[in-house]
Amino acid sequence: KRVMLERDILASTNHPFIVTMYRAMQTKDRLYFFLQYCPGGEFFRMLRRQPKKRIPESYAKFYASEILLAIEYLHLLGFIYRDLKPENILVHMSGHLMLADFGLARCQTSSGKDGKPLQGVSPGIQRRKNRSKKSGFEVPRLSNGRASNIVSGGRNRTNRSGNCFSRLCGGGSHVLGEDSPVVDTESQLDSQNGANRAMSFVGTVEYIAPEVIENKGYAGSVDWWTFGILLFEMLHGTTPFKGKDTDDTFANIYLGDFEFPRSIQTSEECKDLLRLLLAKEMKDRLTSPHIIRDHPFFHGVNWALLRNQKPPIIPEVRHPLDTRNFRSFKD
């Protein structure tokens, strides 16, 4: 069942930061995916080759921008990724990142099945100044009090013809205007008063969100938690809640606070974003891709031209079929 869903998701997507499936072929007992080859290997291995297994904040901002757009796109199609981590991200020969491995992904069947875009515009926006207890970043709210997921209107965000990337990303910095239509992706993914929430205990130990451990049900919020964990790992070479064993790690995730190592210089903007992404309560977590993009940490990112920019690290690739950046597997 999972592998068939993975096939359906790959067949539904068309995005510059998601690996492309060219064809799927099924035999009597096997299913084959013909996927875009990324000779840069796993992003995990690329990180491990860096000094102290971490990268500068400017590099992390670039890579986080690409993954943010990929996750936003999946949510707009009604999919929850559920297993974001460096091992599931591939590096294109150009150095850009490609999200891969949808084996744990979930389709929220009430909205977005078969790759259909989420429908639904919020009836209104109430402009309030809502500040996180630990943050000076203002989070716009809907009239129902939920954090809003605001996108600029008038664009087909899932049209597979032409350059879907420019339609997806828009141009430059967005202004949260009074008349901007709202697509609340988290409300759509978490529709029916939570009746369609996922309950499965899936994911990677150090990346699992508190609501998964608590078994309270979840939707797209888990992807923004793991996005925060990924950003932290890029900057610090380790995950923020790692314990001596699985139980200790779960206890840290559910009950503990994370700290920023004093030995590593991290901007206040980055710290603020991480606190918002790693809020333990789903209602307190930043789950709006548009508002995340507008956070001061991402100031200066040209979203519309991101894929045309030169990545910070270019993998060593001598020819298109080079395998040097992948692990060797013995029979």
What are these regions (language model features)?
Residues 23-24:
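A short, aromatic-enriched beta-strand patch in the conserved N-lobe beta-sheet
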Residues 111-190, 288-331:
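C-terminal regulatory tails of eukaryotic serine/threonine kinases
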Residues 28-36, 44-45:
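A conserved loop-to-beta-strand element in the N-lobe of protein kinase catalytic cores
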Residues 63-64:
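Activation segment signature within eukaryotic-like protein kinase domains
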Residues 1-14:
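Conserved N-lobe beta3->alphaC-helix segment of eukaryotic protein kinase catalytic domains
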Residues 193-197, 211-221:
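Conserved end of the kinase activation segment
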